[in-house]
Design a protein with these regions (language model features):
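N-terminal secretory signal peptides and thylakoid transit peptides that target proteins
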Residues: 1-18
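Extracytoplasmic/secreted envelope proteins and their assembly/folding machinery
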Residues: 51-58, 105, 109, 131, ...
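Sec-exported extracytoplasmic/periplasmic mature domains
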Residues: 62-66, 113-116, 139, 143, ...
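Aromatic-Pro/Gly-enriched surface loop or interdomain linker
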Residues: 26-88, 95, 194-195, 207-254
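An acidic, glycine-rich "communication" segment
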Residues: 35, 125-207, 211-225, 250-251
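Alpha-helical scaffolding within the catalytic cores
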Residues: 73-78, 101-107, 172-175
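N-terminal signal peptide c-region/cleavage motif recognized by signal peptidases
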Residues: 22-24
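Short alpha-beta junction capping motif
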Residues: 88-131
Length: 254
């Protein structure tokens, strides 16, 4: 059975070298399971519906792939040791985050330099206040690495499903912006409210998806799965994703 070796991101954070083997989620171990933890930093706040969206993210990964996920939501502070226990965090909000403290800046800098991955998910892209302020503060964290555009040709859009653009609760721009270090995108800036598309309330969805409704929500879920796979397998080779088996697997509906 072939295996895809996980990249440096979990290894650098002390999670060990793990293997992704189709049909064997236990190969990751508990420490290697994907969890979309919520970052607490500055004056930002993540509403409860989107916290549940983070839980749904892991559930959809488990349901659609052979990768393991941990759906239990968790909040981690940027200046606390708990940040370093897992390699993935989401920073979601709708308002200006204010100025991060120096301890928060140092914590995020260390997390990202060790190989952690951060997704900045603007819950109100129409105003853009959260996204702009997050970019401003992250320029203090990694001043030498300005954001760049990731077009649909980037491996992020091929890790499991073949996608032609990012989407979320709103359609948003056709590209993703990212801070790239070495070969890896360590920060993704999303102007699509991805957690809003994943969030559920009771037996239904917490928010409507515009303008594409059900089809757009499915595409948003697929995009979330791709991000999770990218986080787990950060050393994905661009040529590997063209293998016929993977093309067939990612292209079919789940």
């Amino acid at each position: 059975m072939s295996a895809v070796r996980l990249g440096r991101r979990p290894l650098a954070l002390g999670l060990g070298a793990l293997a992704l083997m189709p049909g064997s989620a236990s190969a990751f171990g508990e420490a290697g399971a994907f969890r979309a933890r919520l970052l607490v930093a500055g004056a930002g706040h993540t509403d409860e519906a989107r916290v549940q969206g983070a839980s749904r993210w892991a559930q959809e990964l488990v349901r659609r792939t052979s990768a393991p996920g941990r759906p239990a939501p968790d909040r981690v502070e940027a200046d606390r040791p708990a940040l370093f226990r897992e390699p993935f965090v989401v920073w979601s909000g709708s308002d200006d985050v204010g100025a991060l403290s120096m301890s928060e800046v140092r914590g995020l800098e260390r997390f990202l330099r060790l190989g952690g991955m951060l997704v900045v998910d603007d819950a109100e892209p129409s105003s853009g206040a959260f996204g702009r302020s997050a970019r401003r503060e992250l320029s203090r964290v990694l001043p030498e690495a300005p954001p760049v555009r990731l077009e649909a040709t980037h491996v992020l859009f091929k890790t499991f499903y073949l996608l032609d653009r990012p989407v979320g609760r709103v359609l948003g721009p056709t590209h993703v912006e990212a801070i790239v270090r070495g070969r890896n995108a360590v920060v993704l800036f999303l102007s699509h409210d991805l957690l809003g598309a994943l969030a559920r309330r009771g037996e239904g969805w917490a928010f409507g998806v515009e303008p594409g409704g059900t089809e757009q929500r499915e595409r948003a879920i697929r995009f979330a799965v791709n991000i999770a796979m990218y986080a787990l397998c950060s050393d994905y080779k661009d040529d590997v994703v063209h293998a016929p088996f993977l093309l067939q697997r990612r292209g079919r509906a789940r």
